[in-house]
């Protein structure tokens, strides 16, 4: 095994660490959809979940291993496991269908974690790590070990732990900045120290994992690459615990745009034009939108690479410069991440073949049933909107691949409001038993009245904690996208919907979020979680 390749391995943990963002809970089908997108994107490793955490996570990892990871050229499918036999056995079982499976096991090494969380001594950790790595190795050849909170661990102790993990069979050692505490110079020095002081480090790939609590995760990772790290653990849109993880799109495009700078650190001539990762950058924007839609986590407009303003210029001086030559104020081409202004316009006279053809050109792969349903939505939208653009098509497709079970189905929405009127809303909803129930309510505004009317029918307790609207397209008949976040029993549930009518989009998003909550309540009754992580 080449433990110092001349390229960077991209390890995506959107489906594991990214899903730990409040409100980002995904069902099995949604995880499968994202895993397929990650494979298209070209990631080397997909960390599909934490199999022992819950039956749902086990099923998701197993299904991803059997579908996305079943071929010889598929990405490596990875499952997380604590350094216990039960966790490791669950991961091995879930990963069995994968052609290239990996177990990722971890144990904390910082004194604060040892004292307050694990209540173990350093000597105990030095004994547990090789034992559990060897146990994982008894199932699979590919084993990754992480010393949790390495960024705050004593370096000398860390060197000992890593040496024992590698001796026991770890093929990758991952160095996590678990709480986003280190600075780039410190993190680079930590990686350099590991390269210089772990005797058998040449037998494993050095990986890094980091959180963005101080906004330094990407900078830390790039410094780590310069000092010998060859695997980067990251997420789409940087989602994850607290302030999130290092952002995949920012890391990949930094390595892409500044290739001549990073080439020598990977043993290449500065002028080499070979990509530093296997990522198909033209899939970045579409993957970002998919993850945002399915998790309900909005990408901030000024987010690097994939934000709505990333390639926008408002200053007259900047606009003039860009019109004369793009490189005056743009360091990368929007088309390099799959964002194009080449908007093919469809209308109400466009047929199924034109619709199918444009979806294929945009890279969407739909089943015949999904295509039929999406075409019906397209025709309905075309009757209300003069022109249908690529952004509209994207919204239609994302609605169709939103796999939340339709237990409660919105059949009718009517709202009355005005400057001298009490906002009222009437709704009709089909319930899980097939009956149609109608009710009405008044509120402080049309959306408030709408949510109250829906609550009277559905009767699922919740707290609406976030409501946002953004335009998908331009013009007076623009498609509007509503994102709603609910909270119940300490957990957050998100959903989104798009429509030319914001009230209709609001109703659909709210019902979709309630469906997510309803499914979660049903699953909790049937199969309580195996452990709390």
Curated annotation (Swiss-Prot):
Swiss-Prot/TrEMBL catalytic activity: 3-methyl-2-oxobutanoate + acetyl-CoA + H2O = (2S)-2-isopropylmalate + CoA + H(+)
Localisation: Cytoplasm
InterPro entries: 2-IPM_HCS-like (IPR050073), 2-isopropylmalate_synth_dimer (IPR013709), AIPM/Hcit_synth_CS (IPR002034), Aldolase_TIM (IPR013785), LeuA/HCS_post-cat (IPR054691), LeuA_allosteric_dom_sf (IPR036230), LeuA_bact_synth (IPR005671), PYR_CT (IPR000891)
Residue ranges that the Swiss-Prot or TrEMBL entry lists as coiled coil: none
Record-given protein name: 2-isopropylmalate synthase
Family from the record: Belongs to the alpha-IPM synthase/homocitrate synthase family. LeuA type 1 subfamily.
Region annotation Regulatory domain: where it falls in the sequence: 409-533
Needed cofactors: Mn(2+)
Keyword Amino-acid biosynthesis: yes
Species, as recorded: Microcystis aeruginosa
GO BP term, pick one: L-leucine biosynthetic process
Domain of life: Bacteria
Gene name as annotated: leuA
EC number in record: 2.3.3.13
SMART domains: LeuA_dimer (SM00917)
């Amino acid at each position: 095994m080449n433990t110092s390749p001349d390229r960077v391995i991209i390890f995506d943990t959107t489906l594991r660490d990214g899903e730990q963002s409040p409100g980002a809970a995904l069902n099995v089908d949604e995880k499968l959809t994202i895993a397929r997108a990650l494979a298209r994107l070209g990631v080397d490793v997909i960390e599909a979940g934490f199999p022992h955490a819950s039956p749902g996570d086990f099923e998701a990892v197993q299904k991803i291993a059997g579908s996305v990871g079943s071929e010889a050229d598929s990405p490596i499918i990875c499952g997380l496991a604590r350094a216990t036999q039960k966790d490791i056995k669950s991961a091995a079982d879930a990963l069995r269908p994968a052609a290239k499976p990996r177990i990722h096991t971890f144990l904390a090494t910082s004194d604060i974690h040892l004292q307050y969380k694990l209540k173990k001594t350093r000597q105990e950790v030095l004994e547990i790590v090789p034992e559990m790595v060897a146990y994982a190795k008894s199932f699979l050849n590919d084993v990754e070990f992480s010393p949790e909170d390495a960024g705050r661990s004593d370096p000398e102790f860390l060197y000992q732990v890593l040496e024992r993990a590698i001796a026991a069979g770890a093929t990758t050692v991952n160095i996590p900045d678990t709480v986003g505490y280190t600075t780039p110079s410190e993190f680079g020095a930590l990686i350099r120290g590991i390269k210089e002081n772990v005797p058998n480090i040449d037998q494993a790939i050095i990986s890094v994992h980091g959180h963005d609590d101080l906004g330094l995760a990407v900078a830390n990772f790039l410094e780590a690459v310069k000092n010998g790290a060859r695997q980067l653990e990251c997420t789409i849109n940087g989602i994850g615990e607290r302030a999130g993880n290092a952002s995949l799109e920012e890391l990949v495009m930094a390595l892409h745009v500044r290739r001549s700078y990073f080439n020598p650190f990977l043993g290449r001539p500065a002028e080499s034009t070979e990509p530093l990762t296997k990522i198909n950058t033209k899939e970045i924007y579409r993957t970002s939108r998919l993850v945002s839609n399915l998790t309900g986590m909005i990408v901030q407009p000024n987010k690097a690479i994939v934000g709505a303003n990333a390639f926008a210029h408002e200053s007259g001086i900047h606009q003039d410069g860009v019109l004369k030559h793009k490189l005056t104020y743009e360091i990368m081409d929007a088309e390099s991440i799959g964002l194009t202004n080449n908007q093919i316009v469809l209308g109400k006279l466009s047929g199924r073949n034109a619709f199918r053809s444009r979806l294929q050109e945009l890279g969407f792969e739909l089943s015949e049933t999904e295509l039929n349903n999406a075409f019906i939505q397209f025709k309905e939208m075309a009757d209300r909107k003069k022109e249908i653009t690529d952004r509209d098509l994207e919204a239609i497709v994302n609605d169709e691949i939103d796999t939340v079970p339709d237990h409660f189905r919105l059949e009718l929405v009517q709202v009355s409001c005005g400057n001298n009127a009490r906002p009222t809303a009437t709704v009709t909803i089909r319930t899980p038993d097939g009956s149609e129930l109608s009710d009405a309510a008044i509120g402080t505004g049309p959306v408030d009245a709408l949510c109250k009317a829906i609550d009277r029918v559905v009767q699922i307790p919740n707290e609406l904690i976030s409501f946002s609207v953004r335009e998908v397209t331009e013009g007076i008949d623009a498609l509007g996208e509503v994102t709603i976040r609910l909270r119940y029993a300490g957990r957050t549930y998100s959903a989104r919907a798009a429509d030319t009518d914001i009230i209709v989009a609001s109703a659909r998003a709210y019902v979709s979020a309630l469906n997510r909550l309803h499914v979660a309540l049903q699953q909790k009754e049937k199969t309580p979680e195996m452990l709390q992580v």
